[in-house]
Amino acid sequence: MGKGGALSESVIKNIVLSYSYVAIWIFLSFTVIVYNKYILDKKMYNWPFPISLTMIHMSFCSTLAFLIIKVFKFVEPVKMTRETYLRSVVPIGALYALSLWLSNSAYIYLSVSFIQMLKALMPVAVYSIGVLFKKEGFKSDTMMNMLSISFGVAIAAYGEARFDVWGVILQLGAVAFEATRLVLIQILLGDKGIKLNPITSLYYVAPCCLAFLFIPWIYVEFPVLRDTSSFHLDYAIFGANSFCAFALNLAVFLLVGKTSALTMNVAGVVKDWLLIAFSWSVIKDTVTPINLFGYGIAFLGVAYYNHAKLQALKAKEEEKKKIQQADEESGRLLEEREGDVEGKKNDQSGN
């Protein structure tokens, strides 16, 4: 084959790899959500201890992240001072602990399908908190889009057959804490030039998260676990669950590294629809037409938001290219001018 054929094979290989990473991420994300629901739901495995489950995940992920970074050295650690850790990582760890605790707690009260619908509010929360912290500029058209997403989720909530107020409060709290965490990552780490991939994030954040979770665990879940047989774990069930949670973080690392964060957002939309279909067909959760109509409105709003972000990124890249081209042109003209001046000096000295 010629060069064209070789190039074609290379392009096809990259496309196949990208789709493979997307498929792996969707599968693992799907598996972790359904697995957590299975463990926590009182009608299934009936182990309703969300803090304990999250602590098991964090312990497992902390250990594996330590082995990958410090022992096997597959991933380079980030330079982290004590001051940066205390001022930046600790607040992020606290928010992450709260987000995971509340989101896992919601599985006890709400269906998988309805939780995915409520998660559509994430862009609304991130944008609103970004504006509050002055990381995002207020734009009326963007705010209208955020309101349309909220309106769609409100309709979906109105049509929910198993509506539970406490479950909704828990999930909305999880969304709020996660959105705040994402904005703080940008403020506390991004502005300092510190970039954490999912593996280094687990290495630095998971132990901190574990420490924060230990405080409510002692008062809320430990007394119940101590007084019941629930304290004896099924290592096969919880080991596989923890491994899936870690593998999901590894998949995020591969997906974002080989494609982009936007690809993950789009893949996330596909995963949400698959989870809703699975929740309805296999778990037998009730999904009403009003649910789907409301989520459809929210879905269109999220899709438009992602499209607008993509267009903004493209415009930013084009602007960078124009500035770079202008700088190169200015440099070339300056060199030519200096060359002309040097030539005239040589002519004058020759005369």
UniProtKB/Swiss-Prot annotation:
InterPro entries linked: Sugar_P_trans_dom, TPT_transporter
Domain EamA: 38-156
Keywords: Membrane, Sugar transport, Transmembrane, Transmembrane helix, Transport
Membrane topology, record value: Multi-pass membrane protein
Region of interest (Disordered), ranges: 321-351
Main location: membrane
GO cellular-component term (any): trans-Golgi network
A Pfam entry, by short name: TPT
Subcellular location: Membrane
Membrane-traversing stretches: 15-35, 49-69, 89-109, 113-133, 141-161, 165-185, 205-225, 236-256, 263-283, 286-306
This protein's name: Probable sugar phosphate/phosphate translocator At5g11230
Organism: Arabidopsis thaliana (Mouse-ear cress)
